[in-house]
Amino acid sequence: MADYNDKNYLLHMSGPDSDTGPGIENEDPRAVENPGHDLAESEGGLAAAMQSIPDTLPILPVRDVVIFNYMILPLFIGREKSVQAVEAALKSGRHLLVCAQKEEATEDPGPEDIYQVGTVVQVMRMLKMPDSRVKILVQGVSRARVREFSQVEPFLEAHIETLPEATPKVDATVEALLRSVREQSEKVLSLRGLSSPDVLAVLQGVDDPGRLADLIAANMRMKTADAQQILETEDPLDRLMLVNTQLQREVEVATVQARIQSSAREGMDKAQKDYFLREQLKAIRSELGDKDDEGEEELESLRAALDKAGMPKDVRKEADKQLRRLAGMHADSSEANVVRTYLDWLAELPWKKLSRDRLDIAHAKQILDEDHCGLEKIKDRILEFLSVRKLNPQSKGPILCFAGPPGVGKTSLGRSVARALGRKFQRLSLGGMHDEAEIRGHRRTYIGAMPGRIIQSLKQAGTRNPVIVLDEVDKLGADFRGDPSSALLEVLDPEQNHTFSDHYLNVPFDLSKVMFLCTANHLETIPAPLRDRMEVITLPGYTMQEKAEIARKHLLPKKIKENGLQEKDVTLDDAALEKVIREYTREAGLRNLERELSSICRKLARRKAEGKKGPFRVSTADVEKLLGAPRFIEDEKEKKLMPGMALGLAWTPAGGEVLTVEATVMKGKGGLTLTGQLGDVMKESAQAALSYIRSRAEELGVDPSFVSEYDIHVHVPAGATPKDGPSAGVTLTTALISALNGHRVRADLCMTGEITLQGRVLPVGGIKEKILAGVARGLKHVVIPWQNTKDLEDVPKELLKRITVHPVHHYDELLPLVFEGKSGKGGVSGAGQAGDKGGKSKAAAGKKDVVAARPAKPAAPARRRKDKTEDELPTAEAGA
């Protein structure tokens, strides 16, 4: 709708004028009287004017405006043809046919450039302007159509026919349409803030559909083509429907516009208020004589900091560019704050600061030995790096990944490495990180943008070559925000990280001097490209002796001090410490052991606080009083195994375990039942073992008819604990043979290895942990695959002295070792070297001993004593 700027006038706001190009405008619409009033008073005059309209009229082309009946409008006439048309009209009845131009840019419109339907107007006033233009005031009289043009020069003239206005009968449908149009008009007026009682009275006072349509169309903002369509519609109801459609569209536009203006006004009001307050503050400072030169001081301070930073030339070029931008900004603008923060980051980064490496190899070894017990491989790798660094100062830093179970000291090892090298230490926890921007940073276009964690760590360290530990790298996630592991590819690539670009800085930063250390529990979850960039060093679990030594040197003194005690107040016997480790913790690391020692110290601290005098000596008997009943009970070592029983070895995240496998036979039809919550791989190992036995039944002393006459049941105790992996293959085979031929398996021997259908024994993992478990159980012999002899280097020599290791290629070599009464010589012990070369011949001899003169019937299930309840083992993955 048009704007109503006064309560007494209904105004038309149609924009530029009717005639020629620039400078041609409508007169101020305030000169136009209320159309409703004019129509009421001059209705008879207009009727007379309509009757006196001649058949031939001068034509006045107008731009960007359509005139409707009863509409009063001032026009400025500038084109010579138009001026002559007006003068001709004044000489003969003061009538003109006003037609809209099809194209506003047309300077000399001809008959084909104007619409054929226009409005006959009566010239009410004329005024000649000093610049040769003419101003006229016209009022619409009647619609008319051009029949034919009678002349083109010196102005357009045409024969016309007027279009009569029908008066429809006002019924319920017409009344509903009238109300709808009025309501839509009121909404538009209200949204534009122009509603007034007088204007609403004008709308309510017009009951004729055609006249109401013309009145509203004359005061509505719409395109010329839409207005022309309304003008050319002869039926009043159809015309009113078109107006109603335009009003609905205008309501939608006005609603959105009002919302936008409200939002903009609120923001403008706040900005004006802030500006006003700042100006007042400046005036107050000026009155106080406090000159505002803080901005210049800040720029000089930033420039000095950038000079001191020692950044590369290309980075300094970008910094100077941003500094010039900042100088041209208002100090309190939001953009200035962004640029200022960016320059602060550039100035505070260690572009040239390097920590001097401590290249004393002996001193570094001493520090590593003080902080960590064992971990010889990792210590050797760090010392190798120091040696290379000493010989070649320009060498790049290694990217190591420490992989192992929780609590074995992966993260603390990074701190020890930094201390040994004399470098600063930073740790980044990557567990649960899903956003790539955490690594690369956010772009400065975002509100609250910051650099990534890598750049932040370098700023905190203050040097360009710290030791940065990327903790829990295997627990990185990925979602719609990106993949942080992909962002780490550049960070951890020595060929690329010398030009690492953070999204926030948007300039290269050299990371090649940084020593990155990653930690992980499981390598399988690390993406292959990322794992390929790291040198993986596996940290095995601690042995009993290592745990006891660490507890004596580090954990116990630490907990005594934390709980307000002194070392002289607490004495923990070796046997008591071993009991705590064996019966209250079951882990590869030390966290639970640390908690149990802390619990002991707290209880002793309470005794001291209650007045009891120390020192307090903790013996084996005192452990249960302080910590309660043991949480883990070691399985009793069997003096004799019943037929069908064999001892295997399993690897768990908490270390190695001795696994008992039981097999029994019963009358049936050759079925095989497997229980003990076994995984698919372990079930397949049992099937392979059974197939191997069936293929060599007679050689193994087993009656071949067992396939059709007996059922076999294999069970692995601790049924609540899931078990899987291929390394129980030889154990399952041995238990099945024992159950089928009735021979007992030696109770002091355990075994591990994958079995094939040909009887070959394949290598498995976790050899160190498995041998440690066998030693802890007190077993004397262990059978391993021959290809695992290389892993014996990781087993402490003192442990190899307590158990004999028997490497085997084929299951035939295992037979003379496992059954009671057979020779157990030819193993590996001491330093872990292979036994005499006669191992194979002995195995062959043993094989002859095992083969019976005739195959034995499957042994009847033996009656055995009731075993003690076995504790559940942690999840055993026999394959490793």
UniProtKB/Swiss-Prot annotation:
Entry's localization field: Cytoplasm
Active site, per annotation: S727, K770
UniProt biased composition (Basic and acidic residues): 27-37
Factors inducing expression: By heat shock.
Record-listed ATP binding positions: G404, P405, P406, G407, V408, G409, K410, T411
UniProt feature, compositional bias: Low complexity: 852-861
PROSITE patterns for the chain: LON_N, LON_PROTEOLYTIC, LON_SER
Single biological process term from Gene Ontology: protein quality control for misfolded or incompletely synthesized proteins
Domain called Lon N-terminal: residue spans: 57-251
Source organism, top-level taxon: Bacteria
Protein name: Lon protease
Name of the gene encoding the protein in the UniProt record: lon
